């Protein structure tokens, strides 16, 4: 839904609404600094008006979470989706949300149909009930800059499950989630099933026992639709890889090319914050294509290239540079296009000369493998993911990368010729993990929203209140290891849960 339906609300927060200025800074420079507002217990009340205003005026909202763990990885990849849902529910009931990222994107029609004002928040949370925290999750989060001392000292307290009395008027994370529902904006996530289950259990109500009831509840909670950027990247945009950092950087690069060519492109603006808030603002830098050129002497880490995660972390001797990975993928794709053109030319030549050798005999080299079609390979890769041999990233959804994605990337690599192999060596980075510091719920939410906005732009689709934003991605949630998504719909055999009905009365009875 477009944000301009709230004409009575000022477009940008004012200093009185949480200390945010009306001035904005364009994000069209070579190095874009994305301001992420850190929200903790000591400034939650101060930032509260800005949070509400950002939600109410947003065209869509992207959400991301950092979790204390995920439980048994193998159960999370169960082929039975109902059993998989139960496994995620168990994790949500026993683990907690450590931080919540919100990125509110507001369309600015007066500055162009593809112009957005982005406001990004990173909320540090502390569940007041007992919960499990997994050592691997702690290790992963600490490697990426998560401060557990700050979380325990300044985390915003919350409780899980159903409400305890009337909480609708309090300034709490649970009330904030209710305001997100009241906003009736499209909700955007990345690999969103686990996020949705954790959000429901931690900030909304006790989870329903079956998946059908859960999806029925979601339909009423988010009538403008739920969008999953991992599904959009893998099945709609057809990116070689679909983990978040790859999809974001790919969209950034393509958007930069369109801007340079004078074609329609995304234009972002961010709020300018006063110096008094400098202690609560964390600026994250995004590099435009061509701004960062390193000497390239080491190889690319295959595991990071495929999954966006490497078990060696910062100690990995190979490159985790996303730009190098994308450069290599694009070189492989160009090589495949050249092969295809040669094959078509040879086919036309053979057709014009009856009696000559067949096409199969004329092909120089083995046939290209089919991508994502080998069921045996799929099964093997799923088993590897389940056993933690690949992509077992703790505390994050991104580790559960589909076997299809890995098979795709391996097949692409096998098609590279000698020239492409040389490119792999020559384009490696001396800086092994340049992107590792980016991983945070707030910035991840921003990247998620950016990917969705770009995919919509690339398809020539615009947000409107009367119909789904991207029909092919509307209410489709990515399922690891599956070729079909989870469709969020209300079945004639499923009714919304009682706890959900009570929350709906609370949401709309007091609005």
Swiss-Prot record:
Residues 350-359 have a biased composition (Polar residues). A zinc finger (C3H1-type) spans 295-323. It comes from the Eukaryota. The keyword Acyltransferase does not apply. Residues 337-349 have a biased composition (Basic residues). A motif (Nuclear localization signal) lies at residues 336-348. Interacts with U1, U2, U4, U5 and U6 snRNAs. Belongs to the CAF1 family. This is Target of EGR1 protein 1. It comes from Mus musculus. The lineage of its organism: Eukaryota, Metazoa, Chordata, Craniata, Vertebrata.
């Amino acid at each position: 839904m477009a944000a301009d339906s709230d004409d009575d609300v000022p477009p940008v927060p004012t200093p009185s609404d949480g200390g945010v200025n009306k001035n904005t800074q364009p994000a069209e420079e070579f190095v874009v600094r994305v301001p992420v507002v850190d929200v903790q217990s000591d400034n939650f009340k101060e930032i509260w008006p800005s949070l509400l205003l950002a939600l109410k005026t947003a065209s869509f909202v992207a959400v991301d979470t950092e979790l204390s763990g995920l439980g048994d990885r193998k159960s999370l990849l169960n082929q039975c989706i109902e059993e998989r849902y139960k496994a995620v529910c168990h994790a949500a009931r026993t683990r907690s949300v450590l931080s919540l990222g919100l990125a509110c994107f507001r369309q600015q029609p007066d500055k162009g149909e593809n112009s957005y004002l982005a406001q990004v928040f990173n909320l540090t949370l502390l569940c007041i009930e007992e919960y499990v925290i997994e050592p691997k999750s702690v290790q992963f989060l600490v490697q990426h800059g998560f401060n557990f001392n700050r979380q325990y000292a300044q985390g915003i307290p919350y409780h899980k499950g159903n409400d305890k009395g009337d909480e609708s008027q309090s300034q709490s994370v649970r009330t904030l989630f209710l305001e997100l529902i009241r906003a009736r904006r499209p909700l955007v996530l990345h690999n969103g099933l686990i996020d949705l289950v954790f959000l429901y259990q931690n900030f909304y109500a006790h989870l329903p026992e079956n998946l059908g009831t859960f999806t029925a509840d979601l339909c009423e909670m988010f009538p403008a639709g739920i969008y999953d950027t991992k599904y959009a990247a893998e099945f709609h945009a057809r990116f070689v890889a679909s983990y978040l950092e790859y999809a974001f950087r790919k969209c950034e690069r393509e958007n930069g090319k369109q801007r340079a060519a004078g074609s329609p492109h995304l234009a972002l603006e961010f709020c300018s914050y006063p110096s008094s808030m400098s202690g609560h603002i964390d600026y994250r830098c995004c590099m435009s294509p061509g701004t960062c050129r390193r000497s390239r002497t080491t190889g690319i880490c295959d595991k990071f290239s495929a999954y966006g995660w490497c078990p060696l972390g910062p100690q990995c001797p190979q490159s985790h540079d996303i730009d190098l990975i994308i450069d290599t993928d694009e070189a492989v794709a160009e090589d495949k296009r050249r092969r295809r053109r040669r094959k078509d030319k040879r086919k036309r030549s053979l057709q014009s000369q009856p009696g000559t050798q067949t096409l199969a005999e004329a092909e120089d080299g083995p046939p290209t493998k089919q991508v994502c079609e080998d069921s045996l390979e799929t099964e093997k890769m799923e088993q590897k993911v389940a056993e933690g041999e690949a992509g077992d990233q703790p505390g994050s959804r991104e580790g559960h990368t589909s076997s299809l994605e890995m098979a795709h990337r391996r097949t692409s690599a096998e098609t590279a010729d000698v020239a492409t192999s040389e490119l792999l060596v020559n384009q490696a980075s001396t800086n092994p993990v340049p992107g590792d510091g980016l991983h945070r719920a707030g910035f991840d939410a921003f990247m998620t929203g950016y990917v969705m906005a770009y995919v919509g732009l690339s398809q020539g689709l615009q947000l409107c209140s009367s119909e789904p934003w991207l029909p092919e991605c509307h209410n489709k949630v990515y399922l690891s290891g599956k070729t079909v998504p989870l469709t969020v719909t209300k079945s004639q055999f499923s009714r919304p849960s009682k706890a959900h009905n009570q929350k709906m009365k609370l949401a709309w009875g007091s609005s």
